[in-house]
Curated annotation (Swiss-Prot):
Listed Gene3D superfamilies: Anticodon-binding domain, Bira Bifunctional Protein, Domain 2
Name of the protein in its database record: Histidine--tRNA ligase
A Pfam family per the record: tRNA-synt_His
Lineage start: Bacteria, Bacillati, Actinomycetota, Actinomycetes, Mycobacteriales
Enzyme's top EC category: ligase
Family to which this protein belongs: Belongs to the class-II aminoacyl-tRNA synthetase family.
Organism for this UniProt entry: Mycolicibacterium vanbaalenii (strain DSM 7251 / JCM 13017 / BCRC 16820 / KCTC 9966 / NRRL B-24157 / PYR-1)
Entry annotated with the keyword Ligase: yes
Gene giving rise to this polypeptide: hisS
C-alpha cells in the first residue's frame, strides 16, 4: 500500500502556499482589474472542451495541438482536452450563447489554469495560470490599441516597469497567400527535417517560430510579412501604432515575431522581460479575424491577449519587487481559558465583519506558545485575554512592533483596533 507521504504534485504543476500565495493572487487580481476598468466583463469557462475545438481553432500544425495538449476519452468515449488556451473557449461560448447578437464589441475577461505538456522550467509550468481578455465583433485599430494598453496598464499597476512590448502585423487575407508562397519557396530550398518540412507545407509561419538554434540561423534571412502587407493591412497597423503613441504606450516593431497559435492575423504582439532569460515572454496576443467563422459562427473579427500570472510574478521578483500584502492577518487573538475562547471568538467575528483580518490561537496553547504563533502570523496587534480579564471587562491589546500592551474595555476593542490600523 502506498504511503500517503510519498504523494507529490505532478511534475510541472506548482502548489501556491501562503504567505507567498498572496503575491500570486495580487498579480492575478491586478491584471484582471485593469481589464474590468476598461469595461471587460468576467466570463468563467469550462476546464475541458471538445478536442476538435482546439484542433480547429488553435491549429493542427502548432506545437500546442500536436505535442502539448492533455487529451483523453471520457466515460462516454468522447475526446476531450484540458484547455491549453482561452480564446477558442471564449469564441465557442460567444457563438453558443449568441453574445455576438447584442452590443459589439463583446468585451470579456477571464483567469484561471490552462494546461500544456511541455518541459517544466522557471515560471513555465504544465499547469499555467493566465489572465486573458477578448474583444469580439469590431475591426477597429483603435480597439487593438485599447487591448494592448489594458495589458500595459495591468503590468504597470503592479509596479512592473522593466518589460518591453514587441509588435508586428501578420497581414490579412489579401496579402497572406502571396507571402505564404514566398516563404514556402524560401523554406523548401533549405535542408529541413521531415517534420519541419511538413510544417512548412501546412503553415510555413510555424517554421519561423522554431526555437532550435540551428533553425533560427537557417531562417534568419527569411522574408517577413511586414515587408509584404497589403495597403489595407499596412494602414491598419500604422493606425494601431499611432494610437499607441497617443496613449504613451512604448513599443518596438519586431518584424520577425511569430506567435505560437495559428489563428492570429494583422496586429500581433508580445510582452517580454529580459530579467527572465531566454524564456522572456510574460504575455501576448493579437487579432484573430477569421477564428469565429472557422468555428461555425458569424464572420466577425476579434482581438485578445493572455498574460502569464506565474511569469509576471517572476518578473516582479527579478526587479526586486513584491505584489500585494504578504502578511496573513492584522490581528491575532490569544484566549487563555474557556470563557475567553468564546468572547474572543465573538470579537474576532466582529472585527472580520469590519474588514479586519483576524486569526485565533487554538488548541489550549500556553501564552508563550500562542505569542510565537502571533509573531509568525505577521499580525500587528495581538489581543490577549483570560477569564479573569473578561470578568474585569477588559482585553489586553499588544503592539507586536513595540511589545507595549494596554488594557482596553471589551466594548471598545473593535473601535480601538480600527483606529490603530487606519
Amino acid at each position: 500500500m502506498t504511503e500517503l507521504s510519498s504523494f507529490k504534485a505532478p511534475k510541472g504543476v506548482p502548489d501556491y502556499l501562503p504567505p507567498a500565495s498572496a503575491e500570486f493572487v495580487a498579480v492575478r487580481n491586478g491584471l484582471l482589474a485593469a481589464a474590468r476598468r476598461a469595461g471587460y466583463g468576467d466570463i468563467e469557462l469550462p476546464i475541458f472542451e471538445d478536442t476538435a475545438l482546439f484542433a480547429r481553432g488553435v491549429g493542427e500544425s502548432t506545437d500546442v495541438v500536436s505535442k502539448e495538449m492533455y487529451t483523453f476519452a471520457d466515460r462516454g468515449d468522447r475526446s476531450v482536452t484540458l484547455r491549453p488556451e482561452g480564446t477558442a473557449g471564449v469564441m465557442r461560448a460567444v457563438i453558443e450563447h449568441g453574445l455576438d447578437r447584442g452590443q459589439l464589441p463583446v468585451k470579456l475577461c477571464y483567469s484561471g489554469p490552462f494546461f500544456r505538456y511541455e518541459r517544466p522550467q522557471a515560471g513555465r509550468y504544465r499547469q499555467l495560470q493566465q489572465v486573458g481578455v477578448e474583444a469580439i465583433g469590431v475591426d477597429d485599430p483603435a480597439l487593438d490599441a485599447e487591448v494592448i494598453a489594458v495589458a500595459d496598464a495591468g503590468f504597470r499597476s503592479l509596479g512592473l516597469d522593466g518589460f518591453r512590448l514587441d509588435i508586428t502585423s501578420l497581414g490579412d487575407d489579401s496579402c497572406r497567400p502571396q507571402y505564404r508562397e514566398l516563404l514556402q519557396e524560401f523554406l523548401f530550398k533549405l535542408d529541413l527535417d521531415e517534420e519541419t518540412r511538413r510544417r512548412a507545407e501546412i503553415n510555413p509561419l510555424r517554421v519561423l517560430d522554431d526555437k532550435r538554434p540551428h533553425m533560427k540561423e537557417m531562417t534568419a534571412d527569411a522574408p517577413v510579412m511586414l515587408d509584404h502587407l497589403s495597403d489595407a493591412a499596412k494602414q491598419h497597423f500604422d493606425t494601431v501604432l499611432a494610437h499607441l503613441d497617443a496613449l504613451s504606450v512604448p513599443y518596438v516593431i519586431n518584424p520577425r515575431m511569430v506567435r505560437g497559435l495559428d489563428y492570429y492575423t494583422k496586429t500581433t504582439f508580445e510582452f517580454v522581460h529580459d530579467g527572465l532569460g531566454a524564456q522572456s515572454g510574460i504575455g501576448g496576443g493579437g487579432r484573430y479575424d477569421g477564428l469565429m467563422h472557422q468555428l461555425g459562427g458569424r464572420d466577425l473579427s476579434g482581438i485578445g491577449f493572455g498574460l502569464g500570472v506565474d511569469r509576471t510574478l517572476l518578473a516582479l521578483r527579478a526587479e526586486g519587487k513584491t505584489a500585494g500584502e504578504t502578511a496573513r492577518v492584522d490581528v491575532y487573538a490569544v484566549p487563555l481559558g474557556g470563557d475567553a475562547k468564546v468572547r474572543l471568538a465573538v470579537l474576532a467575528a466582529q472585527l472580520r465583519a469590519a474588514g479586519v483580518r483576524v486569526d485565533v490561537a487554538y488548541g489550549d496553547r500556553s501564552l508563550k506558545g500562542a505569542m510565537k504563533g502571533a509573531d509568525r502570523s505577521g499580525a500587528s496587534i495581538a489581543l490577549v485575554a483570560g477569564d479573569r480579564d473578561l470578568e474585569a471587562g477588559t482585553v489586553g491589546m499588544k503592539s507586536m512592533a513595540t511589545g507595549e500592551q494596554v488594557d482596553v474595555a471589551v466594548e471598545g476593542v473593535v473601535a480601538e483596533v480600527l483606529s490603530r490600523l487606519s
